[in-house]
Amino acid sequence: MTERNTSTDSPEKRAAGIAAAGLVSSGMVVGLGTGSTVAYTIKELGRRVKEEGLDILGVVTSYQSEMLAIDAGIRLTTLSQDPELDIAIDGADQIDSNLYTIKGGGAAHTREKIVSVSAKRFVVVADDSKTSTQLDKPVPVEVLPFAKEPAVNRIRKLGGEPRLRSAVKKDGPVITDNGNFVLDVEFGVIKDPEALALQLSAVPGVVEHGIFSNVDELYIGKKDGSVKIISRQK
């Protein structure tokens, strides 16, 4: 696997990513998420396209997933052309026992959420390090640059401590694929993710936040190559 896909090979991520790719069949329109675990899914789908004649269309969530899909030989479409997806597969920064999920470490959570809610089935792939009884990691919040300070003030009133995400290899803040800023907001333990999600969505200037409440299934890869599957209780 190339360095653009993952920085280091991970048996757990590989197992989860490849297992989720097995859910895809010819004729499907597939949402392709962003991150190191779903990179294995994209690569496996590409292998099946080339070796098995798998006929699918992919909808990407970021520049990274677009480049991976092109490298893999997956034909791409857009939500404008195909607004209803059969399945979306994505990674997670953290996921709790009720399948509430925090995403956005790659600053792609706005597009990831749009793609996930456009799919009939949303599957998250992860390793054990991403699972937790309750969510407690910072929540990424994409904001309009124009609205940054008012949004910060309102988020503080919700009990959060926002921090503007800085770029690593350039001066200044991270800029999303949509041209916006990202705030990483520390809330401590999040006891009611659904309520917090609604409160963040109501803040003027917030484009989207990284709390996802629509995960249908979680595929957890293990070091021995096995995969544990957890489904949302209906």
Swiss-Prot record:
Keyword Isomerase among UniProt keywords: yes
InterPro entries reported for this sequence: NagB/RpiA_transferase-like, Ribose5P_isomerase_typA_subgr, Ribose5P_isomerase_type_A
Active-site residue numbers: 112 (proton acceptor)
Binding site for substrate: 34-37, 90-93, 103-106, 130
UniProt GO BP: D-ribose metabolic process; pentose-phosphate shunt, non-oxidative branch
Coiled-coil boundaries: none
Catalytic activity: aldehydo-D-ribose 5-phosphate = D-ribulose 5-phosphate
EC number: 5.3.1.6
Keywords assigned: Isomerase
Gene3D superfamilies, A to Z: 3.30.70.260, 3.40.50.1360
Pfam families: Rib_5-P_isom_A (PF06026)
GO cellular component terms listed in the entry, alphabetical order: cytosol
This protein's pathway: Carbohydrate degradation; pentose phosphate pathway; D-ribose 5-phosphate from D-ribulose 5-phosphate (non-oxidative stage): step 1/1
GO molecular function terms listed in the Swiss-Prot or TrEMBL record: ribose-5-phosphate isomerase activity
Keyword Nucleotide-binding: no
Family: Belongs to the ribose 5-phosphate isomerase family.
Subunit structure: Homodimer.
Function: Catalyzes the reversible conversion of ribose-5-phosphate to ribulose 5-phosphate.
Full protein name: Ribose-5-phosphate isomerase A
Species, as recorded: Methanosarcina mazei (strain ATCC BAA-159 / DSM 3647 / Goe1 / Go1 / JCM 11833 / OCM 88)
Gene name of the record: rpiA
